[in-house]
Every structure is written in C-alpha cells, then in structure tokens.
C-alpha cells in the first residue's frame, strides 16, 4: 500500500520555518543594544558567566545575539575570521559594520532557504563612530542620537532580513514589553548610567505582571567606547555595574565621604 503524497505550498513551507525559528528565539532571554553619548551599549540578561551573548568582532564593531547559543557562536567566530582576513588583505578601515551585516544577512538567508533547519538566531552588528567634538552647551542632541556620529546598529533576523535601527535593538525573549519600556524612556544623547538603568529596567519589564529585578550577576554588559583608540570594546565587570546601576541619589551619597576625605588638591611629594 503506497503512502499518500503530502503537498505543502512554498508559502506554507516558509511560514512553518519562520514560526519554528521565532519560537526558538523567543525561548531565550532578551538582549538590548542602544546608542548613548559615549558610544554603543550592550545589555544582555545572561545567567551563565561562561557563555557570552555579547562580544567583540573588530576594532570598532561589536556583536550581540539571542537564540540558540551554538548557532550564533558559529556566526560570531566566522565573522571574526572574515573581518580579520579583510582587514589584513586590504585595510582595517575596509572592515565596516555595514559590510559585516550584509555578509551575515547573506549567510543566514541562505541557511533559512536552503538548509533542512533554519538558524534560531537573531543578531545585531553594531559599529561605533569616531570621536566627535563636544556638543556646545545648550545645544540639543540629534533626534535619534546617531546622525553625524557614524554609529550604526544593524539587526539581522533568522531569515536573513536586515534592518538598520536608529535608536536601539531588542532581541529574544518576550520582547514587546521591553520595546515598549525603551520607547518610553529613550533619550537621545543620554549618558552611560542613565542608558544602563533604562535598559536593565526594560529587560525586567513583563507587561501586565510585576517587573522583575535583575541583579548585576545576571547581566552581561559591554560598551563600544567612542573615545578609545584602536579596539573600543570594553566589558563592564559586576562590581562597576553595581555602582552604575545605583540610583543617582544613592551614588551621590556614596561618593560624598570620599570627596570629603580626599579634597581636590595637588598631591604632595
């Protein structure tokens, strides 16, 4: 007895693959990448110190991802090798965030359409622009915080689609409450502590349920430092993270005794 032939239209086939990939990405924890005055900030909820969801790719380029770890780790290492080869063969300035994002989009898109299983990943390629002159006193920052700075944020989805974001990127998990919270709090040109507190608060948002409180040990945080020369990627350790996350009033109180004990005078001897 022969088995009946089952036909699925190409549209249904692609819808099934998309749903499969989206469900896999949603099972992970969220990641936020946002612009701030000093560069680009990465904040990921990550309870495993041995596994990184945020990392360096090249001099002024960073990488963040959500979804299946082994799949985006393969993409990360491939991106590092590709960037190193291009920088060595041509010039380091030829390694740009736009070029790398396009390379990732082609690879992920091919896997989505040709392989048996699509990658359950969503990635962000971020590039920080060169140092810029200080903004004149009283001058407002740009509406989106990016024009004139050279900062770039690219989101590459599981199907290879690529979108350039102008303010922030949210990936993984149940991200609608996170996006809503960041849309409400985002300010162009905000400083690092303000941006960090807003990102962590957004990651703890759960919609109608009470917000979650995330500890510094549950976070992976890094920046692309605009003022740095050469490699700009810097990880923020848990001790410094706790200080940056402290409310402004608490931080001022903590700094007051140190200021009284160590007045601003030249060292003697």
Curated annotation (Swiss-Prot):
Q: Which gene encodes it?
A: prcA
The pathway that the record names for this protein is: Protein degradation; proteasomal Pup-dependent pathway
How the protein is activated or inhibited is described as: The formation of the proteasomal ATPase ARC-20S proteasome complex, likely via the docking of the C-termini of ARC into the intersubunit pockets in the alpha-rings, may trigger opening of the gate for substrate entry. Interconversion between the open-gate and close-gate conformations leads to a dynamic regulation of the 20S proteasome proteolysis activity.
Q: Which PROSITE patterns match?
A: PROTEASOME_ALPHA_2 (PS51475)
Q: Which family does it belong to?
A: Belongs to the peptidase T1A family.
Entry's Gene Ontology BP terms: modification-dependent protein catabolic process; proteasomal protein catabolic process
* Species annotation: Nakamurella multipartita (strain ATCC 700099 / DSM 44233 / CIP 104796 / JCM 9543 / NBRC 105858 / Y-104) (Microsphaera multipartita)
Q: Which stretches of sequence are listed as region Disordered?
A: 130-150
What GO cellular component entries does it have?
cytoplasm; proteasome core complex, alpha-subunit complex
- Locations listed in the record: Cytoplasm
Q: Which Pfam families match?
A: Proteasome (PF00227)
Where composition is biased (Pro residues), the residues are 130-139
General function of this protein: Component of the proteasome core, a large protease complex with broad specificity involved in protein degradation.
The protein's superkingdom reads: Bacteria
UniProt keyword terms in alphabetical order: Cytoplasm, Proteasome
Assembly and partners?
The 20S proteasome core is composed of 14 alpha and 14 beta subunits that assemble into four stacked heptameric rings, resulting in a barrel-shaped structure. The two inner rings, each composed of seven catalytic beta subunits, are sandwiched by two outer rings, each composed of seven alpha subunits. The catalytic chamber with the active sites is on the inside of the barrel. Has a gated structure, the ends of the cylinder being occluded by the N-termini of the alpha-subunits. Is capped by the proteasome-associated ATPase, ARC.
Q: Which NCBIfam families match?
A: 20S_bact_alpha
This protein is called Proteasome subunit alpha
Record GO terms (molecular function): threonine-type endopeptidase activity
């Amino acid at each position: 007895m022969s088995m009946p032939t089952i036909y699925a239209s190409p549209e249904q086939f692609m819808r099934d693959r998309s749903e499969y990939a989206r469900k896999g990405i949603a099972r992970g924890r969220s990641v936020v990448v946002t612009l701030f005055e000093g560069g680009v900030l990465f904040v990921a909820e990550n309870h495993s110190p041995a596994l990184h969801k945020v990392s360096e790719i090249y001099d002024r380029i960073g990488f963040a991802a959500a979804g299946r770890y082994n799949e985006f780790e393969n993409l990360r290492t491939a991106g590092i090798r590709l960037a190193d080869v291009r920088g060595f063969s041509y010039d380091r300035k030829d390694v740009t965030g736009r070029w790398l994002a396009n390379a990732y989009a082609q690879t992920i898109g091919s896997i989505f359409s040709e392989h048996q299983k699509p990658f359950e990943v969503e990635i962000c390629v971020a590039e920080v622009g060169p140092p810029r002159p200080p903004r004149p006193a009283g001058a407002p920052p740009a509406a989106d915080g990016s024009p004139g700075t050279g900062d770039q944020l690219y989101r590459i989805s599981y199907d290879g689609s690529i979108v350039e974001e102008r303010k922030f990127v949210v990936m993984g998990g149940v991200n609608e409450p996170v996006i809503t919270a960041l849309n409400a709090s985002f300010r162009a040109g905000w400083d690092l502590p303000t941006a960090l507190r807003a990102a962590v608060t957004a990651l703890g948002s759960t919609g109608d349920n009470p917000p979650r409180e995330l500890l510094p040990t549950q976070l992976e945080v890094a920046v692309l430092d605009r003022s740095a020369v050469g490699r700009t990627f810097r990880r923020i350790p848990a001790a410094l993270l706790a200080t940056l996350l402290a409310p402004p009033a608490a931080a001022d109180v903590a700094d007051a005794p140190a200021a009284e004990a160590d007045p601003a005078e030249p060292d003697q001897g």
